[in-house]
Amino acid sequence: MVRQSGSELSDQSDTDISADSDTSASEGSARHSARGRHRDSRQKGDSSSRGQFLERVVRINRVAKVVKGGRKFSFSALVVVGDGDGTVGVGYGKAREVPLAISKGIESARKNFFTVPRVASTIPHPVQGEAASGVVLLRPAAPGTGVIAGGPVRAVLECAGVRDVLSKSLGSSNSINVVYATLDALKHLEDPASVARRRGLDYYHVVPKRIVRAVNSVGASSDTA
């Protein structure tokens, strides 16, 4: 039987420990890189899905329910979602956490999509919408005017793809009422082509003349450039 000295045993144990540590380190780095790849792919997927629609969180409200053991908090989120090209919807989500409430609001908004009639980058005619005590007036504007509106109204119009419009809030300043009043106004818009067919008129007799002139002047300037 061959006896090994204490120094030889310690050298062998040190070698085994270093090999085990190298193996565990390599496995840990592999797991870390795999998690990193998974996280990167997940982030890329989220960014591509967000790129298809515009999402605006108008309001987040915290609600406290008093129970025997204390208070339970929950959150509600009012979210506007649209493609920026004539389609928009509004949703309301409730949950115990803010991100979950926002995601529920987004899903609810996508179920309530509707199409907004437009002429170039504005609305075809003046319109007024009401919801509870909220009243919102919208007027068409010439190209280049921009969205002249407050926060809740602006969120709805930008998601709907209306880039030139004048607005005025005449009633309640509550953001929920203002958003739904804006939606009511957009739902009362009529497509100029269908109105022209119904009245037996030409399309350009239905659209406001100043909007037609502004659109034609913008088109002529772009052709010249």
Curated annotation (Swiss-Prot):
Region (Disordered): 1-50
Pfam families recorded: Ribosomal_S5 (PF00333), Ribosomal_S5_C (PF03719)
Gene Ontology BP terms: translation
Residue span, S5 DRBM domain: 53-116
GO MF entry, a single one: rRNA binding
InterPro entries: Ribosomal_Su5_D2-typ_SF, Ribosomal_uS5, Ribosomal_uS5_bac-type, Ribosomal_uS5_C, Ribosomal_uS5_N, Ribosomal_uS5_N_CS, Ribsml_uS5_D2-typ_fold_subgr
SUPFAM superfamilies: dsRNA-binding domain-like (SSF54768), Ribosomal protein S5 domain 2-like (SSF54211)
Keywords: Ribonucleoprotein, Ribosomal protein, RNA-binding, rRNA-binding
Cellular component terms (Gene Ontology): small ribosomal subunit
Gene3D superfamilies noted in UniProt: 3.30.160.20, 3.30.230.10
Cysteine-cysteine disulfides: none
Compositionally biased tracts (Basic residues): 32-41
Role summary: With S4 and S12 plays an important role in translational accuracy. Located at the back of the 30S subunit body where it stabilizes the conformation of the head with respect to the body.
NCBIfam families: rpsE_bact
Homology family: Belongs to the universal ribosomal protein uS5 family.
Domain comment (free text): The N-terminal domain interacts with the head of the 30S subunit; the C-terminal domain interacts with the body and contacts protein S4. The interaction surface between S4 and S5 is involved in control of translational fidelity.
Subunit structure: Part of the 30S ribosomal subunit. Contacts proteins S4 and S8.
HAMAP family according to UniProt: Ribosomal_uS5_B
Protein name per the record: Small ribosomal subunit protein uS5
Organism this protein belongs to: Tropheryma whipplei (strain Twist)
Name of the gene this protein is made from: rpsE
